Design a protein with these regions (language model features):
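Short, small-residue-biased leader/transition segments that mark boundaries at the very start
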Residues: 1-2
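Structured cytosolic domains appended to multi-pass membrane proteins
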Residues: 7-152
Length: 152
């Protein structure tokens, strides 16, 4: 979960500013085990003031079944609370575990994106937040308001 935006690309940081705290961005990294997922689940209970949860799994090479079930619980809880869930970068080994445990059925209701920037753009669109026009290089333009991104 992001407390600071230093590890975000410039376009991602600008989008987070435009979204003004309405998006909770959670980036997971490394192999996911039960302990890591339970800790995340516990920490997630402290975050309720958001509209969209972006779960970035791009840096998760593997996941065990107990961590998968904990992630499923996080997604279900978020959806039941009326939040939109955007998933980023699910790798094939992780997708296989999700499929084996039936979690793919749950995440079919979530939008899936190849990159975090794509997920943030989708969140902005879902929230009706006009994003800055793309520059010649395809990246959003400059200028944004303040934001607080929570977490990590």
């Amino acid at each position: 979960v992001y407390k600071r935006q230093s590890s975000l690309s410039e376009p991602e940081a600008e989008l987070m500013q435009q979204l003004a705290g309405r998006v909770l961005l959670v980036q997971l990294s490394g192999p996911m085990s039960f302990g890591a997922a339970t800790g995340l689940h516990r920490r997630m209970r402290g975050y309720q003031d958001y509209d969209v949860l972006v779960l970035d799994l791009s840096d998760v090479p593997s996941i065990d079944s107990s961590a998968t079930l904990a992630l499923e619980e996080i997604i279900m809880t978020s959806c039941e609370a009326g939040h939109t869930v955007e998933l980023v970068g699910i790798r094939m080994p992780v997708a296989r575990v999700f499929a084996r445990l039936g979690v793919l059925d749950l995440i079919r209701d979530c939008d899936r994106h190849p990159t975090r920037l794509d997920a943030l753009r989708a969140a902005a669109e879902n929230l009706g937040v006009a994003t800055l026009p793309a520059t010649d290089d395809g990246e959003p333009g400059r200028g944004a308001v303040t934001a607080t991104s929570e977490g990590r």
